[in-house]
Amino acid sequence: MFELPSGAEIQSIIATLKASVGFFIPEIYLSLLFMILIVVDLVVKGRKSTLLSVFSLVGLAGSLYFIYQQHAMQAGEFFFGMYVLDGFAIFFKYFFVLSGMLAVVITMADEQFEREISSMGEYYALVVAMVVGMMMMASSSDLLMIFLSMELVSFTAFILAGYFKSNMRSSEAALKYLIYGAVSSGLMIYGFSLIYGVTAQTNLIAISRELALHGADSFVMLFAALLVLAGFGYKIGAVPFHFWAPDVYEGSPTPVTAYLSVASKAAGFALLMRFVYVALPHTNNVQAATLGIDWFTLLVILAVASMIYGNVVALWQKNVKRLLAYSSIAHAGYALLGVIVMDKLGTQATLFYLLSYLLMNFGAFFVVVLIANRTGSESLDDYRGLGKSMPLAGAALTVFLISLVGLPPTIGFIGKLMVFSALIAKGSIFMWLALIGILTSVISLYYYMLIPLNMYLREPVQHASSNTGTQPRLVAQLFMGALMLLTIYFGLFFAPLSDFARYSASIFGLQLQ
């Protein structure tokens, strides 16, 4: 029979909530920013795109201060074990705020937004809301909180993908994203319900403890694992849960494509790593089956399939955004290699790889936006001759693409080197995974270099308008140059980022060896 809580119990709940609020300050701050942006958009009259853009940038930058303050806080659970604060969560909070800021900058540079959208307040508010949701994903330590935070991110992503309402491609992208997202969410929540049915727990640490003590039916756990993996696989865009990615990335506004391909993917990895490392009873032998489930083999299949499929299919793409979409599938596979290692070195490698991907992928999409402003096209053929007419954009895009391949002296080389080193350090079958990663990187060299080949070695076609447009604004060129220099700088002096990734590799509830 249901009974109302006593006065003492209510007082205890209130005290717990008060004690937990201090750990939630960045999310509260950004939620206020979300509401302020909507109010400013409603109150201020006339053209206010620049005001809203700058306000969003400054507001997002302000959240970095509150995140920095969390370094001094004790790692642990709060909000009744539904939320956790640790170095791992703080890393991703920084990551998501920087992603949001870069998305705002790319939006400011995209002239299509000026033509399609008269008021930008709702758009920037949605970008901020998505940052809040992804922060919650990184800190979620409970099945219910995982699902709620994922849905917050998904709903905002659906709207952003279809933000150009008059554009048929954008509307189609949003619809496909919604359908695939609904199916994957349904599968994942069913998997969560099976786990709850077996353990009677929703907290990840409690689930691990319950499974270690009492075990579970291997068939039920295998079925639940596949369903949960489908949800996480959809979020990171890994094969065979990738079907939404090419069409959604191609049809969405380019700043949204960049945002989804980096930030949303990283949020999926944050959840996947916390779930696999914390909710599952951890053993030193990563190849050993846990509760009758060969997690190692499942993740290996996802990683290898993503690397091979993403790189091979990208060979035939003629649309640059679609090409980068397939390459993002391959990069999900490379990042999964670090997860498979299941030790602190592998976690550090994955975090560093995501940092490198943040820089080089946002940089590549920023140049794609500037070129689209001039040519009105995303076709690979219309990139012909742009190396001469847009020399800085050509040089910057070449550097970003070299980094995406994983060649020195760029940050992408260090990212892949760390992932492959973590695999080789494990020996055995892990060395074969490293070899597959290297070979698929060689494949990616071909399609990535098609873009500089068109820009520098082929004459522009007659119908292209690439020689008649204006040069990018000075601020955009300076920002593009800064991203290019940072891509090279951190390829040479990577120690600060590597140390930060190592510091962030400690996950509450599990001490990786």
UniProtKB/Swiss-Prot annotation:
Entry keyword annotation includes Phosphoprotein: no
UniProtKB keywords: Cell inner membrane, Cell membrane, Membrane, NAD, Quinone, Translocase, Transmembrane, Transmembrane helix, Transport
Entry GO terms, CC: plasma membrane
Top-level taxon: Bacteria
Principal location listed in the UniProt entry: membrane
Membrane-spanning ranges: 20-40, 49-69, 88-108, 117-137, 144-164, 178-198, 219-239, 260-280, 295-315, 323-343, 351-371, 394-414, 429-451, 474-494
Membrane topology: Multi-pass membrane protein
Pfam assignment, any one: Proton_antipo_M
Entry EC number(s): 7.1.1.-
Localisation per UniProt entry: Cell inner membrane
Enzyme class: translocase
Cross-referenced InterPro entries: NADH-Q_OxRdtase_suN/2 (IPR010096), ND/Mrp_TM (IPR001750)
Record-level GO BP terms: ATP synthesis coupled electron transport
One GO molecular-function entry: quinone binding
Catalytic reaction(s) noted: a quinone + NADH + 5 H(+)(in) = a quinol + NAD(+) + 4 H(+)(out)
Assigned protein family: Belongs to the complex I subunit 2 family.
Job of this protein: NDH-1 shuttles electrons from NADH, via FMN and iron-sulfur (Fe-S) centers, to quinones in the respiratory chain. The immediate electron acceptor for the enzyme in this species is believed to be a menaquinone. Couples the redox reaction to proton translocation (for every two electrons transferred, four hydrogen ions are translocated across the cytoplasmic membrane), and thus conserves the redox energy in a proton gradient.
Quaternary structure and interacting proteins, as annotated: NDH-1 is composed of 14 different subunits. Subunits NuoA, H, J, K, L, M, N constitute the membrane sector of the complex.
Full protein name: NADH-quinone oxidoreductase subunit N
Organism taxonomic ancestry: Bacteria, Pseudomonadati, Chlorobiota, Chlorobiia, Chlorobiales
